[in-house]
UniProtKB/Swiss-Prot annotation:
Protein name per Swiss-Prot or TrEMBL: Reticulon-like protein B6
Transmembrane segments: 78-98, 99-119, 173-193
Residues of the Reticulon domain: 68-253
Location of N-acetylalanine modifications: A2
One GO cellular component, as annotated: endoplasmic reticulum membrane
Cell compartments where the protein resides: Endoplasmic reticulum membrane; Cell membrane
Keywords linked to the UniProt accession: Acetylation, Cell membrane, Endoplasmic reticulum, Membrane, Transmembrane, Transmembrane helix
């Protein structure tokens, strides 16, 4: 009788343990499901958003950071407005007033030298110490740094042009030809100085506006690029793939 009582108690304990295990498993599974269904953080969602040209850095970093990026993005409004104002004054002076660059440089030098000459003689006449004119010289290391950076950019451009001329990349060839054609068309509308001024104004407006509205611009840009890729694939299939260059490249590949 005692043994049967012990067996029944043992069965009840094992049954209670099974029920407790099932409850525990259900709680753990529900908690894991809730973790999976938990919405991602805003930073993670923002990281997955498409950015224009596939960039992963902020606009400030893309522009190189430092003072130039601060000027283009209007971090310091007074400095940015001053730079844009000086550029506008130069453009008005040369284009609208039709002042010549060589004449401007000569007149500025004449005015500066005359003012310093008269000031130095006036101080000597009044027995005062003449004004200190600082020595101006370009450091060799800075000059070599600029020349080296320019040389690297030119060499990289020559490598790209050579690879295009050898017919290795038809897509790049068409893009470069189209870009040069666009530049030639724009060059017929404006002279060089006006074109430089327009680019300068664009650099002072477009990055700043894009940084403010990038969350609205990027989805539109993503859709546009997808449509362009679709059209390019159709063009590649119907036209480019039938060209002798493309077939020769496929055979060599």
């Amino acid at each position: 009788m005692a043994e049967e009582l012990e067996k029944s108690m043992h069965k009840e304990e094992s049954l209670m343990e099974k029920i407790a295990d099932k409850i525990h498993d259900h709680d753990s599974s529900s908690s894991s499901d809730s973790e999976h269904e938990k919405p991602e953080s805003p930073s993670a969602l923002k990281a997955k958003i498409y950015r224009l040209f596939g960039r992963e850095k902020p606009v400030h970093k893309v522009l190189g950071g430092g003072l130039p990026a601060d000027v283009f993005l209007w971090r310091d409004k007074k400095l940015s407005a001053s730079v844009l104002g000086v550029a506008t004054a130069i453009w008005v002076l040369f284009e609208l007033v039709e002042y010549h660059f060589l004449s401007l440089v000569c007149h500025i030098l004449i005015f500066a030298l005359a003012a310093l000459f008269l000031l130095s003689n006036a101080h000597a006449f009044m027995n005062k110490t003449p004004p200190k004119i600082p020595e101006i010289h370009i450091k060799e290391e800075h000059f070599l740094m600029i020349v080296s950076a320019l040389r690297n950019e030119l060499n990289q451009a020559f490598v790209i042009l050579r690879s295009i001329a050898l017919g290795r990349d038809l897509k790049k060839f068409l893009m470069v030809v189209f870009g040069l054609w666009i530049i030639s068309v724009v060059g017929n509308w404006f002279n060089f100085l006006t074109l430089v001024y327009i680019c300068f104004v664009v650099l002072h407006t477009v990055p700043m506006l894009y940084e403010k509205h990038e969350d609205k611009v990027d989805p539109v840009a993503e859709k546009t690029l997808k449509e362009l890729k679709k059209h390019y694939m159709v063009f590649d299939e119907k036209v480019l793939s039938k060209l002798p260059v493309a077939s020769l490249k496929a055979k060599l590949g």
